[in-house]
Amino acid sequence: MFGDPIRNTQNRPTTDFINVVKMQRGFDLPVQDRQQDGNIPVFGSNGALARHNVAKVQGGGVITGRSGTIGKVYYTEGDYWPLNTSLFSVDTHGNNIIYLAYLLKMYDLSRFTEGTGVPTLNRNKFHNEPIIDVSLLEQETFAAFVKQVDKSKLAVQKSLEQLEILKKALMQEYFG
């Protein structure tokens, strides 16, 4: 549908990365200060890793690793706290968050990594790089498809879990 966003195989219009989504470094939150009984997800470079009772960002966004784990991209549609090991979207310019998450996965931000010991991703290295510019209508169509696939995956997973429970019950009946 969109083609390779690095090579722009569909010859789509392009713009600077920062015009599609502006990223910023996350915020410090020491482990001892986290309120694990909170309902706000805390995102680090490797995804949601804790909970807290205060959000630093309202309304959802896209998160990727800045230090350590580079290249994985996550999104949330709710409030969250991005840690200092991550970069998060401070301005999506009205673009769809789900679309942006998949776009950034395919854009391969790890290409811009620096450092040998602990890899680091500096937003200034890619903010002015060209990236495809896709209409909001196409983004929304794509996001609806992703949501439907995720909903189907969840239904299949639930069915598998129910089958596993049934199997255990039958095994208990046969061998118990």
Locations of the language-model features?
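Non-catalytic DNA-recognition/assembly elements of restriction-modification systems
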Residues: 1-44, 128, 133-140, 147-176
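Short amphipathic alpha-helical coupling segments at ligand-binding clamshell hinges
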Residues: 99-103, 138-141, 145
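Exposed boundary/loop context
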Residues: 19, 31, 37, 58, ...
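Short, flexible segments with low predicted structural confidence
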Residues: 28, 35, 71-72, 112-114, ...
